[in-house]
Amino acid sequence: MLDRLQAVEDRYEKLNELLSDPAVINDSNKLREYSKEQSDIQETVEVYREYKDVREQLQDAKAMLEDKLDAEMREMVKEEVSDLEVQEKELSDRLKILLVPKDPNDDKNVIVEIRGAAGGDEAALFAGDLYRMYSRYAEMQGWKTDIIEASYTELGGYKEIIFMINGKGAYAKLKFENGAHRVQRVPETESGGRIHTSTATVAVLPEAEEVEIDIHEKDIRVDTFASSGPGGQSVNTTMSAVRLTHLPTGVVVSCQDEKSQIKNKEKAMKVLRARIYDKFRQEAQAEYDQNRKQAVGTGDRSERIRTYNFPQNRVTDHRIGLTIQKLDQILQGKLDDFINALVMEDQAKKMEAAE
């Protein structure tokens, strides 16, 4: 591990030199690339330097115990050794986590797609519950939520809702939400009091930047139509809604949330770019690791990852076997217990694979 850490520190110093080079300063692409690389390893280098400093202090303290010391001084040095050993262990554990390969998408904004699946109107209502849950979680993180496209039902649910969450690290925390979410509750329309089971699917896509994926205008078909609101009524007599079709991949995106056709096209383009990027990313991952299934789930849209049981006020995440009896609070956006546990599980698996 120490050899790897020293190599990281050496690279950090080299990047300092490169970022001072006039040729790099005048090349915006290189400047962005090297700045990001340095930013990505800065915390590792800082913790490694602190770790080296603590190790040196520990060695000096242990060397003092070899000298002739009076009882009081020896006790003080022993206490210092004990404290430094604790610090060394804590820093070593942090470094192991920092050396785990990072997902290059972790810092990105996300596009979230929620669709009512099995269960009809009840599934659509649950899709609305999930949208509000993620919106409140985003608000707690200081992130911004922006609806891109929504298809309403007469009861106030969503057949489909697509929205963007803007915030640093959004993908790192929300990527584990990919999959099928199951709800068990008595619908308001159920007179017999029977519990129904419905599902909604969640897809979390990292926002793709223009430099990451090249989409040509000639490959996109643009269709316009009048937008509609809940219940299907027309809310705009102008042709402001936009549908984009990427001809090479067949990916289709529509947006009608804005009154302006230009703004709808801009929003739709963001979703189109993210979906195409996600398609290529998943294909590359499948080729790289076709048979391996991560403990946190494959991200398959049909995979049941979590159950929300209303009568018992509990939520169970089936991937990590975690059950929490606070469904009401979780639907208010208090997702940290699940998200932190999933992040830790993911890190543990990656550390195990790296050893």
From Swiss-Prot:
One of its GO terms (molecular function) is translation release factor activity, codon specific. InterPro entries: PCRF, Pep_chain_release_fac_I, Pep_chain_release_fac_I_sf, Prokaryotic/Mito_RF, RF-1. GO terms for cellular component: cytoplasm. Methylated by PrmC. Methylation increases the termination efficiency of RF1. SMART domains: PCRF. Keywords: Cytoplasm, Methylation, Protein biosynthesis. It is found in: Cytoplasm. The modification N5-methylglutamine is found at residue 233. PANTHER family: LD18447P. Peptide chain release factor 1 directs the termination of translation in response to the peptide chain termination codons UAG and UAA. Belongs to the prokaryotic/mitochondrial release factor family. This is Peptide chain release factor 1. It comes from Bacillus cytotoxicus (strain DSM 22905 / CIP 110041 / 391-98 / NVH 391-98).
